[in-house]
């Protein structure tokens, strides 16, 4: 999974916890 602070997409669930849709980071 992606480490916290990594850029992510709100539609993908590859973060360790969750993706922030506003900052687009885990």
Swiss-Prot record:
Keyword Disulfide bond: yes
One MF annotation (Gene Ontology) recorded for this entry: calcium channel regulator activity
Summary of the tissues where the protein is detected: Expressed by the venom duct.
Residues found modified as 4-hydroxyproline: 4, 10, 21
UniProt keyword annotations, A-Z: Calcium channel impairing toxin, Disulfide bond, Hydroxylation, Ion channel impairing toxin, Knottin, Neurotoxin, Presynaptic neurotoxin, Secreted, Toxin, Voltage-gated calcium channel impairing toxin
Domain notes per entry: The presence of a 'disulfide through disulfide knot' structurally defines this protein as a knottin. The cysteine framework is VI/VII (C-C-CC-C-C).
Family the UniProt entry places it in: Belongs to the conotoxin O1 superfamily.
Functional description taken from the UniProt entry: Omega-conotoxins act at presynaptic membranes, they bind and block voltage-gated calcium channels (Cav).
Protein name per Swiss-Prot or TrEMBL: Omega-conotoxin TVIA
Lineage of source species: Eukaryota, Metazoa, Spiralia, Lophotrochozoa, Mollusca
